[in-house]
Amino acid sequence: MEARVLGTMIEKRITVPDSYPLTINSLVNGCNQMNNRAPVTSLTEAEVASAVERLRDRGFTGLFTGAATRVPKYAERFGERLGLQAGEIALLCELMLRGAQMPGELRSRAERMHTFADLAEVEATLKAMSELTPPLVVQLPREAGARAAKWQHMLFGGEVPVGEAATLPPSKADRESALAERVTSLEAKVADLEDALRALRIQLGETPSP
């Protein structure tokens, strides 16, 4: 839910700045609108308000105050908080609003918020965000018949669907654990070979070395 709320706030800030910051009511309407959303939701004011508070706790949103403001309005601080560039924000926004997408889809849909020079720039931006610690996005396995693999955001505890986690880059601890297991396995094989060689020498009447 936080992803939909934050994505909506980012979208409205960039595409309709005259209507920004947003009241809870306008934010509910933005979250539940039919276009540029997948899936379409029916969030309530209470649900959206709760999500906004959780985002405030993380420093991603803040209460806007002004002389002409009678109803509380909220603004997002996501890019500022994480030190993101315009292209990164646009891609993450689309991923939060529509879910996993291919680079070509992202380039076309993010055009209203940021213009990418070409598809290669989109892919490079996604790759850079996937290499952060922790990663902000992850590339999913390419589906059968698909032109390209999809990318998914990893914000708010985002999880890779079952069977797709293998595409996540292994952590240092995972790599060290795998290396230790391989060393142990090789040591066991060497010990077995030494035992077999010792037994063969005994059969041949040779004195085995200690």
Model feature map: region roles:
Residues 49-66, 126-143:
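A short, conserved structural fragment
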Residues 78, 84-123, 133-137, 142-143:
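Extended, charged alpha-helical interaction scaffolds
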Residues 82, 172-208:
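Amphipathic alpha-helical oligomerization/assembly segments
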Residues 109-112, 140-155, 195-210:
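Helical coiled-coil/dimerization "stalks"
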Residues 16-40, 100-116:
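Short acidic, hydrophobic short linear motifs in intrinsically disordered regions
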Residues 1-7, 14-18, 52-83:
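Intrinsically disordered, low-complexity serine/threonine- and proline-rich regulatory segments
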Residues 1-21, 83-100, 126, 131-132:
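Positively charged, polyanion-binding regions of nucleic-acid-associated proteins
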